[in-house]
Structure formats: C-alpha cells, structure tokens
Amino acid sequence: MKAVIQRVSEARVEVDGSTVGAIGRGILVLLGVEKGDTERDAAWLAEKMAGLRIFEDDAGKMNLSVREVEGSILAVSQFTLAGNCAKGRRPSFDTAAPPDEGKRLYDRFVDLIRETGIPTATGIFQADMKVHLVNDGPVTFILDTKSRSSST
C-alpha cells in the first residue's frame, strides 16, 4: 500500500457536486492498494496513521499525533498511486490491485482507523472525486508498506 498523507487544517471530498466526507484539523490520506498488499499492510498503515507525530506541540516541534490533537482522518482511495511512469509517456497501472481487492483493503484500513476512536470520513471508492484541502505547513509524507522495517 502506498499513502500520501497531508496534515490539514481542513479537507473535504466531493462527488457529483456533493460533499461526501469532510474533516477539520487532521490528516488527509490518499491511499493506493497494490497487488500483493494484505490486511497486515492495512493494519500497519492504520496504526502508523493513529500514532504518527506530525502535529506541533507547544514548543513548535512535531511531537503530537492526530489522536492527541483530537483531530480527524479523511481517507480517499487513489489507485493512481500504484502507477508507474518509468516507461513511455502514459502511466502503467499493472501493479494496482484489482478493484474488488482494492476496495476490500481500503475498507479494512478505514475500519481499523475507526476502531482507534479517531473520527474518520471517506470518499467513495472508484468515484470521480474532487478533493479540497488546506495543507497545514505544508506537511506531506509518503508511506509505502513495502519499505517498512520489520521492527515498526
């Protein structure tokens, strides 16, 4: 799984002109599921999202998690994160999980986040979505479950 995470002061996702998910302060997660990803990847990523200290404390250091600042998470599926632009001019999506598997693991990731008690909003899987955000910082990170160490 690949995730682009952004610390936001607010974010929302629209489908057909209607807001389907919105948060205030928190994390926007753009999530791409690849072939070979498992529930273990979803669990690792959900745990990482809940505990990642990317919010500033009183001293101005990134030392607080989304839970500690009583923030929320907006999770948006984005299969294009599995795209490969190394050859030619058009991306290849050969490594993207099939839609049914991608949806199953995306839904599992969302369920695991919700189980932590962090308020979580979502987009709609496979919909044409418009994502609006105010990136706070800006603070943006890229996580790939394939590059995690065995100790995390």
Swiss-Prot record:
One of its GO terms (molecular function) is tRNA binding. InterPro entries: Daa-tRNA_deacyls_DTD, DTD-like_sf. Keywords: Cytoplasm, Hydrolase, RNA-binding, tRNA-binding. It catalyses: glycyl-tRNA(Ala) + H2O = tRNA(Ala) + glycine + H(+); a D-aminoacyl-tRNA + H2O = a tRNA + a D-alpha-amino acid + H(+). Its EC number is 3.1.1.96. It is found in: Cytoplasm. It comes from the Bacteria. It holds the Pfam family Tyr_Deacylase. Gene3D superfamilies: D-tyrosyl-tRNA(Tyr) deacylase. GO terms for cellular component: cytoplasm. One of its GO terms (biological process) is tRNA metabolic process. A Gly-cisPro motif from one monomer fits into the active site of the other monomer to allow specific chiral rejection of L-amino acids. An aminoacyl-tRNA editing enzyme that deacylates mischarged D-aminoacyl-tRNAs. Also deacylates mischarged glycyl-tRNA(Ala), protecting cells against glycine mischarging by AlaRS. Acts via tRNA-based rather than protein-based catalysis; rejects L-amino acids rather than detecting D-amino acids in the active site. By recycling D-aminoacyl-tRNA to D-amino acids and free tRNA molecules, this enzyme counteracts the toxicity associated with the formation of D-aminoacyl-tRNA entities in vivo and helps enforce protein L-homochirality. Belongs to the DTD family. Homodimer. This is D-aminoacyl-tRNA deacylase.
